[in-house]
Structure formats: C-alpha cells, structure tokens
Amino acid sequence: MYAIVEIQGQQFKVEKDQKLYVNHFEAKEGVPIIFNKVLLVDNDGFITIGNPLIKGAKVEVSILRSLVKGDKILVFHKKRRKGYRKLNGHRQQFSQILIRNILI
C-alpha cells in the first residue's frame, strides 16, 4: 500500500514505516502529525485517485528529528576581467519524518 501525499507544496510517494526528509517545519520530535492532502492511494492494486484530493484519506506521521541540515551548497558569482568574485553558501534545513499509517 502506498499513497501520494502533498507536504508543504511538494508531492511525495510514501509507504508505511518509510523514513522521509521534508522541508523543515516547526514541531516537536515524537509528536504525531496528520496530513490530509492525499492525492492517490494504491491499496493492493485498487487505485483511488482524488479530484484533486481523496476525501477522508489521511497519512499519519511522527517526527524523528526536527532539524537536519543538508549538504553545503556553494554559489559562486564572477564577472570576467573586472576582478569581481563572490562566494556564498548555505545548508538547507530538513525534518526527518516516519510514516506511521495510511488511512482511507
């Protein structure tokens, strides 16, 4: 059984007991969260597609780690022949969640 769920504007294909990294959101670790924006559910070959969402379908998750930083991304700007160089970098913040259950 799997589902396609929208979490913070991004769509993810999720299955039960799957660990997933999503964009960081403020919540305490271990607290259960329910996502209602379920777009598609596959229940052993029986596929239900929403228009655009499936009414009554939910995905229960819990937060394993509230803040996880991704790899550093470097951004380099340069203008030729002028000596202008600028190097910026940032690390994207993620939250690690665990899919507890998919309810139809």
Curated annotation (Swiss-Prot):
Pfam families: Ribosomal_L21p. The keyword Glycosyltransferase does not apply. This is Large ribosomal subunit protein bL21. Disulfide bonds: none annotated. This protein binds to 23S rRNA in the presence of protein L20. It comes from Azobacteroides pseudotrichonymphae genomovar. CFP2. The keyword Repeat does not apply. GO terms for cellular component: cytoplasm; ribonucleoprotein complex; ribosome. Transmembrane segments: none annotated. Keywords: Ribonucleoprotein, Ribosomal protein, RNA-binding, rRNA-binding. GO terms for molecular function: rRNA binding; structural constituent of ribosome. Belongs to the bacterial ribosomal protein bL21 family. Part of the 50S ribosomal subunit. Contacts protein L20. GO terms for biological process: translation.
